[in-house]
Swiss-Prot record:
Record lineage: Eukaryota, Viridiplantae, Streptophyta, Embryophyta, Tracheophyta
Residues in NB-ARC domain copies: 138-441
Protein source organism: Arabidopsis thaliana
Ranges in coiled-coil conformation: 20-68
Keyword ATP-binding carried by entry: yes
Transmembrane intervals: none
LRR repeat residues: 516-537, 538-559, 562-585, 586-608, 609-631
GO biological process: defense response
Protein name: Probable disease resistance protein At1g61190
Length: 967
């Protein structure tokens, strides 16, 4: 039989429990009423929750931080809401259990428990609703904890730090890039910016510092950022990149953050990482450093800031700090030597620091002299150069994607230290060396060359001076040493590149193995003769320009069958090529400009591959007989030579079927007789034309013309006629949508004394440089009456970068009203006493900080009339001195060594202007040695337009001029 359990309960207890169940809190009796109340109160609570959430969102958009009590309340509401939905979802079933008009239940215990839950939840909802009336829902965020990054004291970066910080803090700037060459101090400056966030307090919620470096992967960047955000646990690491990006975005989207990316080499995809894009709404910031300016544009910063090398005095201060006072004071001679060593670093902080630390303990004068010798002769051999400096710079070289671009970069090391390299000449040589490809069209190849040049500039491997971008580039001396180090196979094959440019050589250097030499540069020395025999069977490039060469031995070039580029220019006493020139069967580039060559050798016709031949300024060359045999010739310059466009020249040139670019002087006959050749002319000088009126219509057919000089021509009016629908019309009525001179970028008008205006230049819409000088009747540049029908269609000077006005005594107006000058960087006005107003208003020039006005005499500045006060305030600071003081040392060899008192001054001139301006001499005396005379003169700050030639080191002057100076 089964077991029985007996529980004894008194009747009074049972009755008491039943009464409490039915009558106490009324969990069963009031269930239906409580459910209705709960539903109503919950709706009110949700409305209150929505209001609080809206308040919080508004405050957080202002970068306020929600109160912790508010967040707790919102969390409780969310929890209660879920519980309420659960209870209400089963309410129909629970109500069916009631009986006796809701006073009792068929399932008393079950209904009692449910009713109790409803009652308690109703109390909680009512309480939460009353607590939701917050006076404040947010507070200012606490000061962000930015851990300062260790950094050494800096010298010379204070101004750059201020500019970079101010720009980053601008409301409209969300992304800012700093670019500059390796070792220039970008990371140091970046650390200073980072540490300023620690000083300024809680403007931002979080500042994230990430070192990217070359080859960094997306996953690595996400992991580094996640660590800063405390996301990087084991679970997070196992997520894919997309989910990681979602997590990063979720954390950062509610924060005002700063992301600092140091040393990026390519575009960083912020979206793929999960970084909310900075905007004026979220006020977040992304800053980065890079060596490549191209990356700045890819990242969205189209006005990046360049970190440049230190100015000389700042560089000296940094170097002194590294060397130490004890060493500098150990011998009075050492200070001067130390300055020389510091100058070798050219303001590069990396080199200044490393070399300064190396020299810190060296107290013997001989040690410093040895350092100067090594840094001058072969800096790569200097202690620590190959370990601490060159490898860091080499990263920029390694990042170049194209092997041809790398070759172009190494090629620039053939030029002297701190040399201003002419870009046109450089690119022409690149074309012949095969760096630019196989394109047979010179214009396309040249454009490709400029693209490659731009790549090197953006990579900060080359630099350019503001205002001279199109003409010259510079390779930093330490970067040049890196290039030579690479070219010599990191010092293992030093005779690959024999570069002894501008080092004072009087004869060619001794080479152990001529057969190993690939490229040789002996330019800018004092070599007079090369008579030795050399078996340079592998030589492809030979630079001998700017020497005092008189004789080039045929034996020296006999074995140079692979020679591609030969530059003999600027040897004023060189008058004859050896017949062995015919053996240079691979030669593609030959430059004989500025020599005294009298005739072309018979053997020249054997140079079947010759593409470029430069014979400009060969004043003794009377004939180009035989040049027609150079069937591959594509580029020929006869400018300022003694060869003119007569019938014999025309016959020779007509047979050059591949010729694409011709530069010649006084060739009206050539232009009229052969339209094909006329179309090839790119630079033209016209002198002594006496037509009245002067008809420029024949120039309209010269599709390739970009440089024009009109000199000593007497005419009062210029006519331009174009054919349109078989009808000739004057230049005032031709279709301005089809300008006559679409390619003309440089124009010089000189000594045209009957010319009154230059209104015709309206039909040269791409004019970049305009130079008008010594024309006494010019009263206005654009005549309003002549141009009135055109100015509604044509806006003049939209491509103009430089305007030079000199010796125009009647000039009163450039243009009658203010004009926009989107590209103008320089206006030079000298001896134009009646010019009182420039065509400028406050909005004419977009970048006034890069704009200069130079006037002489200086008092004319005070007589200028301005459009309004805003215009005056904007441009008055742009007015700079015009006259520069030069010191010239004459060595008696037909050259003048020019030393500018301002080392940053970049001096240009035309050879035929030198004598004109020597009336500016203010002092003349012999130097202390008695070996040369010293000339002080004031020279106009001048820009090269159509016929630019750099005379940074040497000026060639006629001997009779020098003799007259020495009297």
């Amino acid at each position: 039989m089964g077991n029985f359990v007996c529980i004894e309960i008194s009747g009074d207890q049972m009755l008491d429990r039943i009464i409490r169940c039915l009558c106490g809190k009324g969990y069963i009796r009031n269930l239906e009423k409580n459910l209705r109340a709960l539903q109503r109160e919950m709706e009110d609570l949700r409305a209150t929750q929505h209001e609080v959430q809206n308040k919080v969102a508004r405050e957080e958009s202002r970068h306020q931080q929600r109160l912790e009590a508010v967040q707790v309340w919102l969390d409780r509401v969310n929890s209660i809401d879920i519980e309420c939905k659960d209870l209400l979802s089963v309410s129909p079933v629970e109500l069916q259990k009631l009986c006796l008009c809701g006073l009792c239940s068929k399932y008393v215990c079950s209904s009692y428990k449910y009713g109790k839950r409803v009652f308690l939840l109703l109390e909680e909802v009512t309480k939460l609703k009353s607590e939701g009336n917050f006076d404040e829902v947010s507070q200012p965020p606490p000061r962000s904890e930015v851990e300062e990054r260790p950094t050494q004291p800096t010298i010379g970066q204070e101004e750059m730090l201020k500019k970079a910080w101010n720009r980053l803090m601008e409301d409209g700037v969300g992304i800012m890039g700093l670019h500059g060459m390796g070792g220039v101090g970008k990371t140091t400056l970046f650390k200073k910016i980072h540490n300023k966030f620690a000083e300024t307090g809680g403007t931002f919620d979080i500042v994230i510092w990430i070192v990217v470096s070359q080859g960094a992967k997306l996953s690595k960047l996400q992991e580094d950022i996640a660590e800063k955000l405390h996301l990087c646990d084991d679970l997070w690491k196992n997520k894919n990149e997309s989910d990681k990006a979602t997590d990063i975005h979720r954390v950062l989207k509610g924060k005002r953050f700063v992301l600092m990316l140091d040393d990026i080499w390519e575009k960083v995809d912020l979206e793929a990482i999960g970084i909310p894009y900075p905007s004026e709404v979220n006020k977040c910031k992304v800053a980065f450093t890079t060596r490549d300016q191209k990356v700045c544009g890819q990242m969205g910063d189209h006005k990046p800031m360049q970190v440049k090398c230190l100015e000389p005095e700042d560089a000296w201060e940094l170097f002194k700090n590294k060397v130490g006072d004890n060493t500098l004071r150990s011998d009075p001679v050492i200070v001067g030597l130390a300055r020389e060593v510091a100058q070798k670093c050219r303001g590069l902080p990396l080199a200044l620091s490393c070399i300064g630390e190396t020299m810190a303990s060296k107290t013997m004068v001989q040690e410093w002299e040895h350092a100067i010798d090594v840094l001058t002769r072969s800096a790569a051999e200097f202690s620590d150069m190959q370990n601490k400096i060159l490898p860091i710079l080499k990263y920029s070289y390694d990042s170049l994607e194209d092997e041809h671009i790398k070759s172009c970069f190494l090629y620039c090391a053939l030029f002297p230290e701190d040399d201003k390299i002419d870009t046109k000449t450089l690119i022409n040589k690149w074309i012949c060396e095969g760096f630019i490809g196989e394109d047979q069209v010179i214009k396309r190849a040249r454009n490709k060359g400029y693209e490659m040049l731009g790549t090197l500039i953006r990579a900060n491997l080359l630099t350019n001076d503001r205002g001279f971008v199109k003409w010259h580039v510079v390779m930093h001396d330490v970067v040049r040493e890196m290039a030579l180090w690479i070219a010599s196979d990191f010092g293992k094959q030093k005779e690959n590149y024999v570069v002894r440019a501008r080092v004072g050589l009087h004869e060619i250097p001794k080479v152990k193995d001529w057969g190993a030499v690939r490229r040789m540069s002996l330019m800018m020395n004092e070599i007079e003769e090369i008579t030795c025999e050399s078996k340079c069977s592998e030589l492809t490039t030979l630079f001998l320009q700017s020497n005092q060469l008189k004789n080039l031995s045929g034996e020296f070039i006999r074995y140079m069958q692979k020679l591609v580029v030969l530059d003999l220019s600027h040897n004023p006493d060189f008058n004859e090529l050896p017949e062995q020139i015919s053996g240079l069967v691979s030669l593609q580039y030959l430059d004989l400009s500025w020599t005294r060559i009298e005739q072309l050798p018979v053997g020249l016709k054997e140079l079947k591959k010759l593409i470029f031949l430069n014979l400009c300024f060969t004043e003794r060359l009377c004939s180009i007989s035989g040049i027609s045999r150079l069937l591959s010739l594509r580029w020929l310059s006869l400018r300022e030579s003694n060869v003119h466009g007569d019938a014999s020249v025309l016959k020779e040139l007509q047979q050059l079927e591949n010729l694409q670019d011709l530069r010649i002087t006084e060739s009206a006959e050539l232009i009229s007789l052969d339209q094909r050749l006329a179309k090839l002319i790119s630079v033209l000088r016209i002198e002594g034309f006496l037509q009245k009126p002067f008809d420029l219509s024949f120039l309209a057919s010269m599709e390739n013309l970009y440089g024009l000089l009109v000199e000593n021509s007497y005419f009062s009016e210029i006519n331009i006629k174009c054919r349109e629908s078989e009808t000739e019309s004057s230049y005032l009525h031709i279709n301005p949508k089809i300008p006559c001179f679409t390619n003309l970028t440089g124009l010089i008008i000189m000594k045209c004394h009957s010319m009154k205006d230059l209104t015709w230049i309206l039909f040269a819409p791409n004019l970049v440089n305009l130079d008008i000088r010594d024309s006494r009747e010019v009263g206005e540049i654009i005549n309003k009456e002549k141009a009135i029908n055109l100015t509604s269609i044509i806006t003049p000077f939209q491509k103009l970068e430089r305007l030079f006005l000199y010796g125009l005594p009647k000039l009163e107006s450039i243009y009658w009203s203010p004009l926009p000058f989107p590209l103008l960087s320089n206006i030079v006005v000298k001896y134009c006493p009646k010019l009182r107003k420039l065509p400028l208003n406050a909005t004419s020039v977009p970048l006034v900080e890069e704009f200069e006005i130079r006037m002489d005499p200086p008092e004319q500045e005070n007589e200028l009339e301005w459009e309004d006060e805003d215009t005056k305030n904007r441009f008055l600071p742009s007015i700079k001195p015009l006259v520069r003081r030069l010191k010239i040392h004459y060595s008696g060899m037909g050259f003048l060594n020019v030393k500018n008192q301002n080392p940053r001054f970049f001096f240009y001139c035309f050879i035929y202007l030198l004598v004109v301006h020597l009336d500016c001499i203010i002092d003349l005396h012999s130097d202390t040695s008695g070996m040369c005379c010293v000339v002080h003169l004031d020279y106009v700050f001048h820009f090269p337009f159509v016929f630019p030639k750099t005379f940074c080191i040497l000026f060639r002057l006629h001997f009779y001029t020098i003799k007259s100076l020495c009297v």
